[in-house]
């Protein structure tokens, strides 16, 4: 793909879809929400349509059964979009300035926002300002900074 000439955004979209194509997830609300947050609305839509088409090609005799989980995931996808579910860092109802005020600094601000998004997408935390602030404060007090290699 590197030698073919594509627009940068098209190439990125194809790479993202290929990266998640083999990823299996149950047709459950939290799983679909996590995938939406990880890959974005457009890539998730394309993934679900591709999965439906792939199943149609692989299992023409048992098409209904093969497509059932992807149809359920598509219904959940549409439900989440209709509810304007939080699926990106920009949609979180807490800003970097508030995380700085709590005490996070530097890269830990971005890591904290990502952690909060993961919890919202897993449906363990509501995307409400007060709930996000309280969770961020608990994370900060616990010493969590999102470091994986000891460097900030």
Go through each PLM region and give its residues.
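Divalent metal-dependent catalytic cores for phosphoryl transfer on phosphate-bearing substrates
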Residues: 1-66, 71
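Charged substrate- and nucleic-acid-binding regions of tRNA-handling and nucleotidyl-transfer enzymes
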Residues: 58-152
């Amino acid at each position: 793909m590197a030698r073919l000439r594509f627009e940068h955004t098209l190439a990125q979209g194809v790479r993202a879809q290929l990266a998640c194509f083999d990823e299996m997830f149950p047709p459950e609300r939290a799983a679909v929400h996590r995938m939406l947050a990880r890959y974005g609305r457009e890539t998730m839509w394309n993934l679900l349509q591709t999965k439906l088409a792939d199943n149609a090609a692989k299992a023409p005799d048992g098409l209904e059964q093969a497509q059932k989980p992807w149809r359920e995931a598509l219904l959940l996808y549409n439900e989440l979009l209709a509810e304007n579910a939080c699926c990106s860092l920009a949609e979180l109802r807490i800003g970097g300035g508030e995380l700085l005020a709590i005490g996070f600094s530097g890269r830990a601000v971005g890591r904290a926002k990502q952690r909060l998004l993961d919890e919202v997408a897993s449906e363990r935390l509501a995307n409400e300002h007060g709930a996000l602030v309280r969770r961020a404060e608990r994370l900060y007090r616990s010493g969590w900074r999102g470091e994986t290699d000891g460097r900030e």
